[in-house]
UniProtKB/Swiss-Prot annotation:
Physiological role: Plays a role in the outgrowth of motoneurons and in the formation of neuromuscular junctions. Following muscle denervation, promotes nerve terminal sprouting and the formation of additional acetylcholine receptor clusters at synaptic sites without affecting terminal Schwann cell number or morphology. Delays the retraction of terminal sprouts following re-innervation of denervated endplates. Plays a role in targeting the monocarboxylate transporters SLC16A1, SLC16A6 and SLC16A7 to the cell membrane.
InterPro entries in the cross-refs: Ig-like_dom (IPR007110), Ig-like_dom_sf (IPR036179), Ig-like_fold (IPR013783), Ig_I-set (IPR013098), Ig_sub (IPR003599)
Disulfide bonds: 88-144, 180-238
SUPFAM superfamilies with a match to the protein in the record: Immunoglobulin
Name of this chain's protein: Embigin
Cytoplasmic membrane side: 286-328
Glycosylation sites: 55, 62, 75, 100, 117, 189, 196, 214, 219
Induction section of the entry: Regulated by muscle activity. Strongly up-regulated after muscle denervation, including that of soleus muscle. Expression is significantly increased 3 days after denervation and reaches a maximum, about 130-fold increase, after 5 days.
Location(s), subcellular: Cell membrane; Synapse
Encoding gene, per UniProt annotation: Emb
Pfam family, one: I-set
Principal subcellular localisation of the protein: membrane
Region annotated Disordered, chain positions: 289-328
Membrane spanning residue stretches: 265-285
Length: 328
C-alpha cells in the first residue's frame, strides 16, 4: 500500500494518462515476434563468427624450394581452430618474375582471394596463403605450385593417436587392458569400438559389464576386457574426437585357449619319444649285428669239419696201380 501511495505522490494528476501511454508504447508484445527485438538480443552471424575467432592464434609454416629441392612436404598438426599462414619460398639463379604461382587444396584449385600474397624480389619468390581453420572441412592437403616443376605441400591433420603396434596376446579366462594415448594433446572425448566381423560397433559399458573404460589422464584411455573368451579376440579401435576432426588407432587382440601353451611341450615330448625309439632300434640292430658274425664263424667251423672228415675218408681208400694191358 505504501508503494502505491508513493507512486501517486510522484505523479501529477495531469500526467497520469501520458504515463500510461508511454508504458503501453514501451511494453514488449510477447504474442507477436518483433524482428527488431530479436536483432537487439542476439548478434548477427557474421559478428558472432568474428567474436568467436577473434582470439585464435596465428601459426606460420614455411617450405623452402630450390633448384635442387623442387618437391617438399611438411606435416602440420592442429588440435583446435587456428589462423594459418602457409608460405612457399623459392630461390633461383634465373629470373622468377615470369613464374606463375597457384595454390590447391587437395586436387581443387583455390581461387585468388585476399588471403593470397605473392612477392617477387630479385631471384627470390615468396607466396603466402592465409586462412582460418575452424572445422574439419578446412583440414587436408594444401599445395603451392611454382611453375610446372616446383611444389610444396602442407599436410594439415589432427593429432595422431598411439596404441600398441603389435598384437596383444592373452589367454582364456584372463583380463586384459587396451590403452591408447595422444601425446601433447587433449581430446574432447574418447570412444572405443570393436569389430563384429563386418563393421565397427561402439562399446557401451552401461550395457555390457564385460568392459570398463577409464583413464588416469585426459590424453589417454584404457579399455579393460574381463573374463576373456576366444571370441573376444579380434580388432579394437580407440577414437579421439577433436574440434577439427577425429583420429583413431587399431589394436589387435589375440585370445588363446589353454591347449595352445601346452602344444610346444607336447611337441617336445613327442620328439623325445621318437628319439628314444630310434636309439632303441639302433641298439637292437647293433646287438644283432654283433651276434651275426659268431653264428657265421660256427657255420664255417662246421663246414670245415665236414670238409676235413670227407678228406680223411678219401685218404683211407686203397689205391690201385694201373698196369699196362700188355702185361696182363
Amino acid at each position: 500500500m505504501r508503494s502505491h501511495t508513493g507512486l501517486r505522490a510522484l505523479v501529477a494528476p495531469g500526467c497520469s494518462l501520458l504515463l500510461l501511454y508511454l508504458l503501453a508504447a514501451t511494453r514488449p508484445d510477447r504474442a507477436v515476434g518483433d524482428p527488431a527485438d530479436s536483432a537487439f538480443t542476439s548478434l548477427p552471424v557474421r559478428e558472432e563468427m568474428m567474436a568467436k575467432y577473434a582470439n585464435l592464434s596465428l601459426e606460420t609454416y614455411n617450405i623452402s624450394l630450390t633448384e635442387q629441392t623442387r618437391v617438399s612436404e611438411q606435416n602440420i598438426t592442429l588440435e583446435r581452430p587456428s589462423h594459418l599462414e602457409l608460405e612457399c619460398t623459392f630461390t633461383a639463379t634465373e629470373d622468377v618474375m615470369s613464374m606463375n604461382v597457384t595454390w590447391k587444396k587437395d586436387d581443387a584449385l583455390l581461387e585468388t582471394t585476399d588471403g593470397f600474397n605473392t612477392t617477387k624480389m630479385g631471384d627470390t619468390l615468396y607466396s603466402q596463403y592465409r586462412f582460418t581453420v575452424f572445422n574439419s572441412k578446412q583440414m587436408g592437403k594444401y599445395s603451392c605450385f611454382l611453375g610446372e616443376e616446383l611444389r610444396g605441400t602442407f599436410n594439415i591433420r589432427v593429432p595422431k593417436v598411439h596404441g600398441k603396434n603389435k598384437p596383444l596376446i592373452t589367454y582364456v579366462g584372463d583380463s586384459t587392458v587396451l590403452k591408447c594415448e595422444c601425446q601433447n594433446c587433449l581430446p574432447l572425448n574418447w570412444t572405443w569400438y570393436m569389430s563384429n566381423g563386418t563393421a565397427q560397433v561402439p562399446i557401451d559399458v552401461h550395457v555390457n559389464d564385460k568392459f570398463d573404460i577409464n583413464g588416469s589422464y585426459a590424453n589417454e584411455t584404457k579399455l579393460k576386457v574381463k573374463h576373456l573368451l576366444e571370441e573376444d579376440g579380434g580388432s579394437y579401435w580407440c577414437r579421439a574426437a577433436f574440434p577439427l576432426g577425429e583420429s583413431e588407432e587399431h589394436i589387435k587382440l589375440v585370445v588363446l585357449s589353454f591347449m595352445v601353451p601346452l602344444k610346444p611341450f607336447l611337441a617336445i615330448i613327442a620328439e623325445v619319444i621318437l628319439l628314444v625309439a630310434i636309439i632303441l632300434l639302433c641298439e637292437v640292430y647293433t646287438q644283432k649285428k654283433k651276434n651275426d658274425p659268431d653264428d657265421g664263424k660256427e657255420f664255417e667251423q662246421i663246414e670245415q669239419l665236414k670238409s676235413d672228415d670227407s678228406n680223411g675218408i678219401e685218404n683211407n681208400v686203397p689205391r690201385y696201380r694201373k698196369t699196362d694191358s700188355g702185361d696182363q
